[in-house]
Amino acid sequence: MIDLTCSSFARATNVTWRTFDGNSILLHLESGVYYTLNPAGTLIWELLDRRIAGQDLLTVLRDRYSVEEEEARRDLVDLLEEFAREGLISIHEHEIKYR
């Protein structure tokens, strides 16, 4: 399971996409598979245009849709895990340093 507190995420370079009426269509250029995102998925996808911390994604999602943190966390982790399985994003783990 993805840990949002010590990971950051970015779009894979082999994916192209377009947005229509708030929804997005993604095309994985190597596999030729298309994916459709609803407006919430589109918001997350747009934020992945640069490497972004999982906690920052969670904050945006929670604030935009006024949902409880645990619900937003579950939905975000599910989406990011699906993106990762399909090769649509890269995940960067951060080492946690203790003093």
Task: Locate each region found by the language model.
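Long, charge-rich, low-complexity alpha-helical segments
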Residues: V33-R99
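Acidic, low-complexity/disordered tracts enriched in E/D and polar residues
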Residues: M1-T42, E46, H92-R99
